[in-house]
Amino acid sequence: MADYLISGGTSYVPDDGLTAQQLFGAGDGLTYNDFLILPGYIDFTADQVDLTSALTKKITLKTPMVSSPMDTVTEASMAIAMALTGGIGIMHHNCTPEFQANEVRKVKKYEQGFITDPVVLSPKHRVRDVFEAKARHGFCGIPITENGKMGSKLAGIISSRDIDFLKSEEHDLALSEIMTRREDLVVAPAGVTLKEANEILQRSKKGKLLPIVNGNDELVAIIARTDLKKNRDYPLASKDAKKQLLCGAAIGTHEDDKYRLDLLVQAGVDAVVLDSSQGNSIFQINMIKFIKEKYQDLQVIAGNVVTAAQAKNLIDAGADALRVGMGSGSICITQEVLACGRPQATAVYKVSEYARRFGVPVIADGGIQTVGHIAKALALGASTVMMGSLLAATTEAPGEYFFSDGIRLKKYRGMGSLDAMDKNVSSQKRYFSEADKIKVAQGVSGAVQDKGSIHKFIPYLIAGIQHSCQDIGAKSLTQVRAMMYSGELKFEKRTMSAQVEGGVHGLHSYEKRLF
């Protein structure tokens, strides 16, 4: 007892851990796995943690999550889901200006619960087409119209009960022979409210789809019973002053991007991201000034940057937020190929510490593999995190599912991959290579395992961030950052063996289910 008893009191507590300034002041480039946050004191529940965060100077989100402007991550479906769950989606620009503007328009015109662009078939399609649609999209409740398109007269509906017990030799049957015909359907008129539609479905007790038709009996939308269940209430939804969902879009920094910008503004875009792998350029500075002169109220997210010196030029030009990251994404090989970039944790801390002096929020872009990485990025000063691979292969991500070795996958590629560059010149412009005869790839193309729906995945991420803040002892992300800058929040570097210890180890086999 006497060997270690020094004092009967507990007023003395030794100084422990490193401040953020000490952690990142040594000159080492650190990633999210290189350190941990030391826990604090808990006197509240996790669900009390406020995750409200600034996306830009004028746009605030209730959850700090942004989907990346990549052509295998964000189009209208992803942007809608992100906004409904409290974040925002940034529409990619590896497409025509008209297509991109139309995707933004879909988000801004979205009415909760109504599906305006469903899979539609015609009576002439075959049963095998339904099975193919089911394999691609994961469902087989499909409206049938006269010409197989929206806006055509409703002819019937195909559901799983119509095809489940058909023999393989019957897969060539025309849908007109087996579908539930129009006269046997319960429909709702255009203009019906979500509440009224819900009541109609409950009363009818027929099927899983409710077609919405206009006065000419033409299909204008559908409502799925499963969607009614999950769309009843989105208290965190990101909306503008007109109660429309928030939506962002990426553009380049070239002269022809000004036309794209005009179309996006006409579509109602809330923020534009100047999409460049290296944002500290005269091209981006000039584009920021042009936008601020022509569309004063439009929020401009500039980047990408990884140093305070880069950030200074974009802030001086009028940027409303900064996107931080260079070469840290899972499909990015910029650091390997060009020897330029910065480890992501260091980049986020250094740029955030500088930008906060001017009231400019930072988006941590790249290197996010787990919910723990999100918590670390936010604790280092980022206001929001941008996710690519973490959201790839969700139901709402663009692309079709395919199977490999029995695993359901979706394609995921970097915008600096040759695959993406070959699709559209916008991807080449992002890396200043549109005029090059020889393209230098700064990304790769691959596949990611099916993660299910955003509506299940994002709530898991939200809960994880809240529990992280609880362990830290902070009731809000604002408090987390205040603790970090004051030096109250402490960190500790991890050796390689510490990282092994912090992961799953010592098991013969295990199943890792996150939610």
Curated annotation (Swiss-Prot):
Protein name listed in UniProt: Inosine-5'-monophosphate dehydrogenase 2
UniProt keyword annotation of Cell inner membrane present: no
GO CC, alphabetical: cytosol; nucleus
Pathway: Purine metabolism; XMP biosynthesis via de novo pathway; XMP from IMP: step 1/1
One biological process term in Gene Ontology: GMP biosynthetic process
Enzyme category, top tier: oxidoreductase
Species this protein is from: Xenopus tropicalis (Western clawed frog)
Active site residues per record: C332 (thioimidate intermediate), R430 (proton acceptor)
Function text: Catalyzes the conversion of inosine 5'-phosphate (IMP) to xanthosine 5'-phosphate (XMP), the first committed and rate-limiting step in the de novo synthesis of guanine nucleotides, and therefore plays an important role in the regulation of cell growth.
A GO MF term: IMP dehydrogenase activity
